[in-house]
């Protein structure tokens, strides 16, 4: 590394360009966990612009989720949320995994995880969200992950804690320089988050 004048600890930026295959509805790029989640959040906010909602919405782009959910902890201290929707790019299993073991696949909608190593998502909130998706005909997937972690862990355990769920856009080869996602899953995630925000009010929050 010294021959290339690269010091330990210096950042590396993969030379990957975003690419869109409109014919197949595929999205290609780097760091979709969590760029694709951030993009879905921004698109949902854009579509909700000017609309009256039953709740106040604060959107956060937090840093360092992969190394201890540090940014979300700072956000919780500043915002003090009553409830949270965590958006991310979640791993898709539909590559070399046996069909019976696939929990998350492309073109089947956002993934709502019940738990992973870091968190058990608020059960009543999770069930309410899944029932809402079924009522509105929005496709969603459910999973229980043996690894991983996300900002819901910090949100539910910082200060007084706030109920949290995770809406993940499925991503093949997450955490790599070349990720794959789909327009279908992106759009379904945006629609689901909009539906949640249009239906969350004080009574709903108290029920969790």
What are these regions (language model features)?
Residues 1-208:
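N-terminal hydrophobic/helix-forming segments and targeting peptides
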């Amino acid at each position: 590394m010294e021959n290339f004048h690269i010091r330990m600890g210096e950042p590396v930026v993969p030379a990957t360009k975003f690419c869109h295959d409109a014919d197949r509805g595929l999205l290609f790029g780097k760091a979709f966990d969590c760029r694709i989640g951030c993009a879905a959040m921004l698109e949902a906010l854009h579509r909700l612009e000017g609309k009256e909602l039953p709740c106040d919405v604060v959107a956060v782009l937090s840093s360092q989720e992969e190394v201890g959910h540090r940014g979300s902890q700072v956000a919780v201290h500043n915002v003090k949320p009553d409830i949270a929707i965590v958006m991310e790019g979640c791993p898709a299993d539909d590559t070399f995994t046996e069909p019976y073991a696939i929990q998350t696949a492309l073109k089947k909608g956002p993934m709502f995880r019940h738990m992973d190593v870091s968190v058990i998502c608020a059960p009543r909130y999770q069930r309410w969200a899944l029932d809402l998706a079924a009522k509105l005909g929005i496709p969603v997937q459910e999973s229980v992950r043996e690894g991983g972690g996300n900002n819901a862990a910090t949100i539910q355990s910082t200060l007084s804690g706030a109920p949290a769920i995770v809406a993940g856009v499925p991503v093949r080869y997450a955490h790599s320089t070349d990720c794959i996602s789909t327009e279908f899953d992106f759009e379904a995630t945006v629609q689901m988050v909009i539906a949640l925000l249009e239906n969350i009010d004080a009574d709903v929050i108290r029920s969790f």
